[in-house]
């Protein structure tokens, strides 16, 4: 049985709940167990995964990053998006960990809601499927 850590950014609560719902629905249909930790914003996701990887207290087979960044009127959106993607990539490449990336970047809340809804784009569910496939691949290539 695979163990997965879901790191869920709760900055946009409604979107966070939809992402998590889609991910959990997908994981319940698999042979995986999961823990969920909430972080204040999407920017904190890479550090939280790194904390778990380096802690030695937990033994997760894969990680699921869920969050949302919505474009505003300043450059903040670009910096957060870049920081999150680069941070996740760095952790994945350095520690060779399976990851499902369910971080939505959208121009509006309405577009983000469509992507998060499990009955529409289901980004959370797709990210969960990805981490499960990456865990299988990781195990095959060990």
UniProtKB/Swiss-Prot annotation:
Q: Which EC number applies?
A: 2.5.1.78
State the source organism's domain of life: Bacteria
Pathway terms, separated by semicolons: Cofactor biosynthesis; riboflavin biosynthesis; riboflavin from 2-hydroxy-3-oxobutyl phosphate and 5-amino-6-(D-ribitylamino)uracil: step 1/2
Cellular component GO terms, alphabetical: cytosol; riboflavin synthase complex
- UniProt-annotated catalytic positions: 76
GO-annotated molecular function: 6,7-dimethyl-8-ribityllumazine synthase activity
The residues listed in the UniProt record as binding (2S)-2-hydroxy-3-oxobutyl phosphate, with positions renumbered to this chain, are 73-74, 115
Pfam families assigned to the protein according to its UniProt record, in alphabetical order: DMRL_synthase
Cross-referenced Gene3D superfamilies, in alphabetical order? Lumazine/riboflavin synthase
> What are the alphabetically sorted keywords of the record?
Riboflavin biosynthesis, Transferase
Q: Which residues bind 5-amino-6-(D-ribitylamino)uracil?
A: 11, 42-44, 68-70, 101
Recorded catalytic activity of this chain's protein: (2S)-2-hydroxy-3-oxobutyl phosphate + 5-amino-6-(D-ribitylamino)uracil = 6,7-dimethyl-8-(1-D-ribityl)lumazine + phosphate + 2 H2O + H(+)
GO aspect biological process, one term = riboflavin biosynthetic process
Q: What does this protein do?
A: Catalyzes the formation of 6,7-dimethyl-8-ribityllumazine by condensation of 5-amino-6-(D-ribitylamino)uracil with 3,4-dihydroxy-2-butanone 4-phosphate. This is the penultimate step in the biosynthesis of riboflavin.
To which protein family does this belong? Belongs to the DMRL synthase family.
Name of the protein:
6,7-dimethyl-8-ribityllumazine synthase
The protein's gene is named ribH
